[in-house]
Amino acid sequence: MKKKLFALLLAAALTVCAVPAQALTGEGSRAAQTLSALNVVRGAYNVNDPATRAQAAVILVRLAGAEQAAAADKTHIPFRDVPAYAVQSVRYAYGRGWLTGVTGDRFGASEAISTQSYCAALGRMLGYTTDDFSYENAVSFARHMALTSRDYGETLTRGDLFELTAGALYARYKDSGSTVLEHLCAVSP
């Protein structure tokens, strides 16, 4: 376990160090590099593009190390606007209460995800409930949990999404005390 964790951390550090400084366009790119080394982010980073709710669901499920579980999950979702690439992730995140729809029958998959919504989803993924924080104070709770120390706009760019996600790597799950990174390393093949 410790060897695997060390290897993943070393791979993440080497990946970031191997990229020339001028090729990185800020914290979002650095976070994307780290998450890519952990197989949480794949493909083009497009850090300045708006982050959609569908993209956030996919990243959240990967961060939880739950892609295989999501593939097996058959939870019914009432949403008809979820693209094929995100159906399993939305189903899984919705089934666990991490994300909700924007209406009863619409997920809002192509809409930009709000900072508040993603912070709430991260808190829920970590096992926190309405007894611990409310949707209204989700951003404050994320700061309290040290997921972020900076202010974001009302909606997130992909770079912002990557930064918040990378910030969650060292957050501890409420009930187990293990970090997201430790859990991710434990469930990674």
Kindly give the residue locations of the regions a language model identified:
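Feature responds to low-complexity, polar/acidic, surface-exposed segments characteristic
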Residues: K2-Q88, R96-T155, L169-P189
